[in-house]
Amino acid sequence: MKPISFSFRSGILFLLFSILFFSGWSQEKTKIKTKGPAHKDTMVMHVSPLDTLVIERILGMKGKFNNGEYKVTIPQNDLSVEVDGFKIIPAMGLGTWVDFAASSDGAMIMGDLVLTENDLKPVQQEIIRQGLTISAIHNHFIRNHPNVMYMHLGGSGSLEQVAQKVKAVLDKIKEVRGGDPSKGTASNEAVPNSLDTRQLDTIVGYKAEMSKGVYKYTIGRPDVSLKEHGVTVTTFMGFNTWAAFQGSPDHAAVAGDFTMLENEVPLVIKALVEHGIEVVAVHNHMVHEQPRIFFLHYWGVGNALQLAQGLRAALDQTSRKNNSMSGMHMNP
């Protein structure tokens, strides 16, 4: 047997070296690919459950726990607001709320503050001073007396730090108003309601809850997986459509909020307007959400069943998965 030539041995060594080199390069390339934003979206975040006792201790109030989230709500009982002769009470959308959700750095908050025109500037300044963010300022009503605005805030950090920041903002509202909004009595009474709620449920396709004369639907979007900074935004956290009815069968009022994907916006507006319901605001609530979501506030006065038909027509312009009683979501 002839000995293996030098050139043949060199070829074998070169082939082995090439295989090892390209195999290692491929693995390194794969590692590099996983370092971008896309990897962050798919990365499993390790989060600790919220310690609700910390929130309660710092804020000095109790909230409601739901599927790992904790929400505090402050009814604005010190504000006496009317629109077109209808009294707007907290159940009709006159309530400040802040939701806490567990996140990788401790907690993420989202909230909606009810503010008077005099509150707006000092509360804005306090939010920025605390290192929180403002993501939306808008109205819910028109022709309302006095005029009220709604300001959305957000932030994240350790649970204790975030709760302390929220406390500072809520304390600023008390300071400017000259008292605790929840302790007032101006909006703390029931409104008249003689509506046929069964007929409303049949038309709208959902069941609602009655609170002090306000019959309110809260409808989630289970067809949309919404995230803000990697944290899931739920119905409980404000990702929902709602409608609040009061009054009599022939003279009712409905106020509410629609949540919409961008392509649904013109369709929902058209359906509401064609049914005589005023669209009073179109806006965002968040700025880093995925996918992009818009919100719309509306106000209608008239025959209760006709208003419900208008609401149903607008709902039909959103996800078809959301159009049956099986998808019912009760009020948060």
Residue ranges: model-predicted function:
Residues 22-29:
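Bacterial Sec-dependent signal peptides at the C-terminal "C-region" and cleavage site
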Residues 29-147, 154-293, 299-332:
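Long, contiguous binding/interaction regions
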Residues 2-12:
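Bacterial N-terminal signal peptides that target proteins for export
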Residues 11-21:
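Bacterial N-terminal signal peptides
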